[in-house]
Amino acid sequence: MIVRNILSPVSLLILFLLSPVLQQASARDRIPLKKAPATSIFEKKDSWVDETLGRLSVSEKVGQMIVASIDAQYKSNTDKEYVLMSRLATEGKIGGIMFLKGDVVSAGMLANHFQSVSTVPLLVSADMERGLAMRLDGATTFSPAMAIAASGDPTLAASMAKIIADEARAVGIHQNYAPTVDLNINPANPVINTRSFGDRIPLVISMSAAIIEGLQSNGVVATAKHFPGHGDVTVDSHFALPVLEGDRQRLDDYELKPFRAAISQGIMSVMVGHLAVPKLTGTLEPASLSKTIVTDLLRDEFGFKGLIITDALNMKALNDGRSLQDICVKAVEAGNDILLFPVDPEGAHKAVTAAVECGTIPLSRIDDSVRRILQVKRWLGLDRKKLVDLAQLQDHVASQEASEIAEKIAADAVTLIRDRDRVLPFRIPMNGPIVDIILNDKPGEEIGKRFAERLGMDYALIHLRLDPSSKEAVFKSAAEMTRGASAIILTTGIQAFSRSVPSKLSARQINFVRDLPSMVAPGTPIVFVSFGTPYILEAFPEIGTALCAYSENEFSEKSVIQVMKGELVPKGSLPVSLNGGLP
């Protein structure tokens, strides 16, 4: 279950031992959350901001601009990563931390520890597009953006964002690297896809606005990403440099519109992507390192007054012959306020500090960024209360209300792409044999396992998996099983697939799916269910019935089974054009 008792006996013992620290962060000291938009936050004078900025050394100012990453897992006080991060926080060489995978109790403990050793409060962040559980076990899991858009209900998006904010603040996290406002115009996009609200500009703006409001009205900084738009590329920037080919008119008409809307709404942070925009910059320089994109376009022309943050600096899109030191200096020169996730945060700090001290980067450039960072920390109330009360975790994390919202999003998102032969809901004997074929684009025994187990509770079930390494004997066995089946379900969790870029499926897998209708007895129901991208369903028109749930979480799986049994009518609306092209 997603919602569960998150405090084990061991965790409770840890909390008891930490009680002297927790008393400093009691509920009586809860800071009322402000709701001022970015347009006012970053313009007004503030004595705490001025005084803090005035007493920081050059080294400490540069440190404010660096956000280092750490796993949110229990660490002893001799753990190398723990010791390093503690020292960097103590010495003022980092201004924030980004949590990777872990659990809610450990995250809260680590956040409190690093805050306690840092003179200036730390800005703690995480990528929580699908909720806090995307990073931390014990929290509520939500469906991705495309599922939320398919539900067609911005109020659900706002409710989800409010829950994410409440859970995040409970463990000491202040900034969410969401929403993704990229228009997923290209079906072959390998990195955005279901992370996007779709390819329809009004829908993307509406859903993004709900997420921004839900986060920021509940005390968490929202971040629009990946400027100037990562939706029409065919390369994953984690591995290589994508190129956005559009000219300025094209970007104004499409990619830039959701960012303009978010800025007008008062979003507090924008993340710049690692992608080239040659028709704007005249080079293949990544946008995140381009003054033309970061300062001239985003800061000056768009008038954005909030925090500008790089995408993670460990991504291979940046590492084509560039050193980390060069990347960090270039990112600051471009106009970024925060350098996210440098592999060597101390090396990044040293490089930027040296660039300031030798005059390559003006100190005024650093001061501008640090002032904005401190203004955000002031808005968050971190100058008054920077520790969290872990004894209250169960009051805020994985509540019944959160579970109900997550389940409703999943149910409302299920989209019937087509049902040419009207096979849904199933009209077969409950004990009739159903064959569930799990279509993987990589080896693995876990993908689709939980759905098969749950399906087997309602039907007599045979399940098997086909991946690119499957031998011919496996395909022959699968074909034989389908011939006597009462119904066949093809399930997949593939995140990126289109007619033009057929993911990593083998030719044998593709041909098997295409030939499947001719293998079975006439009238045998065949349903293709995607727990990931909807584009794969268009790539196999031979299958007459297709459902998209957009997500592999347990609520989505439950909803699909309810559709098959006639207990749920699928009412989701497809948020993208399956044929691609401009919306």
Describe the function of each predicted region.
Residues 71-74, 126-134, 174-184, 224-230, ...:
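Short glycine-enriched loops at secondary-structure junctions
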Residues 26-88, 300, 322-583:
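Preference for extracellular/luminal or secreted protein segments
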Residues 54-57, 97, 105-122, 132-134, ...:
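Second-shell residues forming the walls of enzyme active-site clefts
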Residues 61-65, 92-96, 118-122, 169-175, ...:
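Loop/turn elements at helix/coil->beta-strand transitions in domains of secreted/extracellular proteins
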Residues 68-80, 146-157, 240-254, 315-322:
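Active-site mouth loops of central-metabolism enzymes
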Residues 1-11:
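Bacterial N-terminal signal peptides that target proteins for export
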Residues 63-65, 85-104, 187-188, 263-285, ...:
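Short acidic, glycine-rich surface-loop motifs adjacent to enzyme active sites
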Residues 10-20:
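Bacterial N-terminal signal peptides
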